[in-house]
Amino acid sequence: MAELPTAPNGVPSGDYLHRSIDQLRSLGHLTTAQLVHDYKPFNISEFRQNVAERLDYSLKNGLVQHQQQMVMEQQPHPDQQQQQHLHHPQQQQHPPQLKVSYSAPNSPPTPHEQQEQKYDPNRSPPRQQMSSASGSGSNGSSPEEESRRGDGDQAKPYKCGSCSKSFANSSYLSQHTRIHLGIKPYRCEICQRKFTQLSHLQQHIRTHTGDKPYKCRHAGCPKAFSQLSNLQSHSRCHQTDKPFKCNSCYKCFSDEMTLLEHIPKHKDSKHLKTHICNLCGKSYTQETYLQKHLQKHAEKAEKQQHRHTAQVAAHQQHVPASGIGLNLQRQAMNDVNAAYWAKMGADSAAASLAEAIQQQLPQAGGQPYGNFASLQQQHQQQQQELLHHQRLADTPGHSHSPHEEAAGEDLVLRQSTPQHHLQQQQQQQQQQQAQQQQQAQHQPSPGPGNSAFTPLSATVAPPPHLQQHRGPPGSAAAYLYQQNAAAAAAAFPTQLISLHQIRNYAHQPGAAGLIAGDHLALGLSAVNAAKEKAQ
């Protein structure tokens, strides 16, 4: 059985333990700000001394013996069970005192203590081993169950329920659970930033104060760091075969050339674009960027060469360079746009419209309605028939029967068919010759007021015995104009015509030229009669 030692001052161990526990509890009531500000002066130093004394106490009382027993348990020995049974009651005799002695709060050691003590908590923490030893006795777990555990479970028996990480100490597990729960009890009073661990807060405060407690112990190296990890990375430069180190960062190099290439990165000219491309003029800060850019130029040149070869091959095969797919697409677009009219002038548009109308119009008697030559012939025939009817009415001594007047009206309103066209022309010519002879015999010589171009109202009135057949002069003139208007309306086509057809129709004799044609015919007949009489 191991006896509890006395304190260094000769005070019994029980009083010493109770007094240390009271001091630790009083420290636990302090705020975070007091812990931070009182870190260097007084309270924390006493706490360090207490922790050091407890570590020495744990090392002196059964720690080495417990480690030896663990090694013996791993080795096959016939008396293994007897030793375990003998060791088990010894641990059960003093579990309360050991638990009380390790009830101190968790706080990491300072950098100086880490360098002096060289204490690795992940390797063999004394608190974990003593608590595991006491826990095995208190929980009543048999040594057989402990022997069944693997080496990994013995090294890190505390597993996190949220992730797959395991820890060697329960305090480390409690610190790790703060990450999952989002608990950050330590806060910086300068920038109000919060942390899950006190060590993280201490490292953060050094960024505000500029303290660098981790100094390099290599001869002739004056560097110091605020974090231990930076010191460890720096110490590798002295341990390896890289004597050439950069004064601006922690990197080391094996030769001087690589160091000289690395140094310009820390100068003021590191942002200057000194590497220029000879092809396009672009500039870059590093040569690697320029090389990547030149690779793009090479890829573009290869693509252009492939395109040129494809164009040459297509030209030799008489295939457009655009490809068959584009030609098919263009043909499809032309087919879609075929429903729309192409851009053309007014005359060409009117001519195309006239052709379309003539093709669509129904043909009656083998001749289309849009044939203006046939319409013009019909106009001339109607004019001749009207003149013949008027001259018969104007000739003195010629008696008009109702049948003749009806026949004359029928001639005016009737449209000649193409079959009797030649016969009617011959008859009209004969009638005109006969009328001219009769007019030359019965018509007096033209006076100064009677001219071939005088209007109809200025002509000589007929004899009284013909007034009953003719009616007043105004009625005869009105009847003539009505007949001309009816003929013009019948001659004009009812379908839509084009602008080109309208232009041609304006230059042809139509409804507006009927009256002028009558006067012209009368004048010619009078001149011919005068010539015959003179002969």
From Swiss-Prot:
One of its GO terms (molecular function) is RNA polymerase II cis-regulatory region sequence-specific DNA binding. Disruption phenotype: Death at larval stage. Larvae display a motility defect whereby the body wall musculature overcontract radially during the peristaltic wave typical of insect larval motility, apparent as a 'squeezing' of intestine. The modification Phosphotyrosine is found at Y479, Y481. One of its GO terms (biological process) is neuroblast development. Keywords: Developmental protein, Differentiation, Metal-binding, Neurogenesis, Nucleus, Phosphoprotein, Repeat, Transcription, Transcription regulation, Zinc, Zinc-finger. A zinc finger (C2H2-type) spans 158-180, 186-208, 214-238, 244-266, 275-297. It comes from Drosophila melanogaster (Fruit fly). InterPro entries: Zinc_finger, Znf_C2H2_sf, Znf_C2H2_type. Belongs to the krueppel C2H2-type zinc-finger protein family. Its main location: nucleus. Residues 145-156 have a biased composition (Basic and acidic residues). The keyword Nucleus applies. The keyword Transport does not apply. Residues 70-97, 131-142, 419-443 have a biased composition (Low complexity). Transcription factor involved in neuronal fate specification. First required in embryonic CNS development to define the number of cells that express apterous (ap) in the ap thoracic cluster of interneurons. Later on, it plays a central role in the combinatorial code of transcription factors that specifies the fate of the Tv neuron in the ap cluster by participating in the transcription regulation of FMRFa in Tv cells. Also required for projection neuron dendritic targeting. The modification Phosphoserine is found at S399, S401, S475. This is Zinc finger protein squeeze. It is found in: Nucleus.
